[in-house]
UniProtKB/Swiss-Prot annotation:
Cofactor: Mg(2+)
Binding site for (2R)-2-phosphoglycerate: 163, 336, 365-366, 387
Species of origin: Dictyoglomus thermophilum (strain ATCC 35947 / DSM 3960 / H-6-12)
InterPro entries xrefs: Enolase, Enolase-like_C_sf, Enolase-like_N, Enolase_C, Enolase_CS, Enolase_N
Pathway membership, UniProt: Carbohydrate degradation; glycolysis; pyruvate from D-glyceraldehyde 3-phosphate: step 4/5
Main location: cytoplasm
Record family assignment: Belongs to the enolase family.
Keywords associated with the record: Cytoplasm, Glycolysis, Lyase, Magnesium, Metal-binding, Secreted
NCBIfam families: eno (TIGR01060)
This protein's name: Enolase
Length: 424
């Protein structure tokens, strides 16, 4: 098995123009793997720590030179000589070297960049695609995309409290679903223009029009789906990411768009109303990460009819997910590799979720890069769903293009389950 010859880190930029970490892993047989880590805007309080320099003279304090230095001077020395195909040992070595619960010494961004680059180097050494290296011959399911086409909350400068309004194309193949979504996206742009609304795009490639009520985007999306020639719910469904932790204060949900302060029960009733009125198949972070009792009620109320995805509440952490499963919280988990900070721990979380019957949604972050690792990961683990932004901005499109390549490569072996991924 090829051993690690060298590990190098560098500071590069993400899609928001902020510094992030890139790592390269060199093997003795000449193989090389490279990976760049993303960064989030709305983050769970228990996420692994993204190490920043906090030097106001560089990048307004957002530099990552310390994380890069940790790769070049600390991590590299420990990994040289280890077998690249032994991902568990590589990751375990870095985690133990860090020695903290949230990877705050070396930085989750440093550890993750090396972890993902190691997997890429190993795949290159074997001469196989990344998805096949990670998942073996069972890796053949293309994910149904949840595409963020209207932004609110922290992702936009408008009155909307909810962070993401998504379309979910349900064709018979990934390629066809992508086409359907593109046609809805461009129709949506035309509708927004006709209403005199802003069609500039945000961090994730979605529109951020000035809409006054949290329900308004859902009505416009239904209109766009119909005008594009599709049937809402049958051809193209809807999904929400509320990022509710962002508007949860003192036990209440502060909906500024509606001018209301809701209790957990009232918030659940509002979500039930939206599900009754619109073809919603998935709700992410419908309640705050601090409102576990509310989450239990939400799951009991809506869990048999819609997918309830835990992001901030689980932060891709296998221990927290196991606790949530035991308590009957949610029925799906959003998987963000940089929330936990290593490939091994990410795969552990996915395994625990699937064993418990929870769905997994592989996800990007709002600060992305050209790296397409999550596209391969979604196929490798047969997650069945991916969230990687809208139908604009190269940092988002790169993932969709990679999935098109994978579907073509798999040929007749490729699976695309569409709406079946959301059936309760």
């Amino acid at each position: 098995m090829p051993a690690i010859l060298d590990v190098r880190g560098r500071e590069v930029l993400d899609s928001r123009g902020n510094p992030t970490v890139e790592a390269e892993v060199y093997l003795e047989d000449g193989s090389v793997g490279r990976a760049i880590v993303p960064s989030g805007a709305s983050t769970g309080s228990r996420e692994a720590l993204e190490l920043r320099d906090n030097d106001p003279k560089r990048y307004k304090g957002k530099g990552v030179l310390q994380a890069v230095k940790n790769i070049n001077e600390i991590i590299a020395q420990e990994l040289i000589g280890l077998e690249a195909l032994d991902q568990y040992t590589v990751d375990k070595t870095m985690i133990e070297l860090d020695g903290t619960e949230n990877k705050s010494r070396l930085g989750a961004n440093a550890i993750l960049a090396v972890s993902l680059a190691t997997a890429r180097a190993a795949a290159a050494s074997l001469g196989v695609p990344l998805y096949l290296y990670l998942g073996g011959v069972q890796a053949r399911e293309l994910p149904t995309p949840l595409m963020n086409v209207i932004n609110g909350g922290k992702h936009a400068d408008n009155p909307l409290d909810f962070q993401e309004y998504m379309i979910v194309p349900l064709a018979s193949t990934f390629k066809e679903s992508l086409r359907w979504a593109v046609e809805v996206f461009h129709t949506l742009k035309s509708i927004l223009k006709s209403k005199g609304l802003n069609t500039n795009v945000g961090d994730e490639g979605g529109f951020a029009p000035y809409l006054e009520k949290n329900e308004d985007p859902l009505a416009i999306l239904v209109e766009a789906i119909q005008k594009a020639g599709f049937e809402p719910g049958k051809d193209v469904a809807l999904a929400l990411d509320l990022a509710a932790s962002e508007f949860y204060e003192n036990g209440k949900y502060i909906l500024k768009a509606e001018g209301k302060e809701l209790t957990s029960d009232e918030m659940i009733s509002f979500l039930e109303y939206l599900c009754d009125k619109y073809p919603i198949v998935s709700i992410e972070d419908g309640l705050s990460e601090k409102d576990w009792d509310g989450w239990k009620k939400l799951t009991d109320k809506l869990g048999k009819r819609v997918q309830l995805v835990g992001d901030d509440i689980f932060v891709t952490n296998p221990k927290i997910l196991a606790e949530g499963i035991e308590k009957g919280i949610a029925n799906a988990i959003l998987v963000k590799v940089n929330q936990i900070g290593s490939l091994t721990e990410t795969l552990d979380t996915i395994r625990i979720a699937h064993q418990a019957g929870y769905r997994t949604v592989i996800s990007h972050r709002s600060g992305e890069t050209e790296d397409t690792f999550i596209a391969d990961l979604s196929v490798a683990v047969n997650s069945g769903q991916i969230k990687t932004g809208s139908l604009s901005r190269t940092d988002r499109i790169a993932k969709y293009n990679q999935l098109l390549r994978i579907e073509e490569e798999l040929g007749e072996a490729a699976l695309y389950r569409g709406i079946l991924n959301f059936k309760r």
